[in-house]
Amino acid sequence: IYVSMEGKKAPSEPQRYDAVLGAIGRVPNGKNLDAGKAGVEVDDRGFIRVDKQLRTNVPHIFAIGDIVGQPMLAHKGVHEGHVAAEVIAGMKHYFDPKVIPSIAYTEPEVAWVGLTEKEAKEKGISYETATFPWAASGRAIASDCADGMTKLIFDKETHRVIGGAIVGTNGGELLGEIGLAIEM
């Protein structure tokens, strides 16, 4: 497959690739739920807006999962369900989506957690990155997994890790370590 690219740093000639990952995404069905009959507001894209305790604009109605927004991941929805149940039971819990791991189960795996560079820019965070090629890791070489890399995104002022990505065999299994670094 040959791909032509655009942009300041784009190569002038089409580039050859052996494989392409196509991802089309998902669409919420908030408009199909007739949530408006209960007074629940649905935005133009079909999402139901909630607060940090998963309450909708109708205080006794909660919403969780794909219908409340990105990322549309099952483990996020399960955690939101736990938070909503705890709030309904009278506890003062809330949902903090800062560390939600995402993994594309491709070969090699592509995994990320925390803020991306784009999100850091949008939030006005001054950041730096550090990248480690797996070809420099004896363990990766010995495991025949040297085709990969780990990238960390950290706050330039505090030096705290705010995000990271891993591309490589079983990269998703290492993602928890970056998530832990973000939360510490």
Please state what every model-predicted region is.
Residues 1-14, 20:
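Conserved beta-strand-loop-beta-strand element in the redox core of flavoprotein oxidoreductases
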Residues 5-6, 23-25, 38, 52-53, ...:
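Fold-independent oxyanion-binding glycine-rich loops
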Residues 8, 56, 118:
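Flavin (primarily FAD) cofactor-binding/catalytic cores of flavoenzymes
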Residues 15-88:
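FAD-site-proximal beta/loop scaffold in flavoenzymes
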Residues 75-98, 125-126, 180, 184:
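Internal hydrophobic alpha-helix adjacent to the cofactor/substrate pocket in enzyme cavities
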Residues 89, 105-184:
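Flexible, glycine-rich terminal cap/loop adjacent to redox cofactors
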Residues 93-109:
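Flexible, acidic loop-helix segments that line cofactor/substrate-binding pockets
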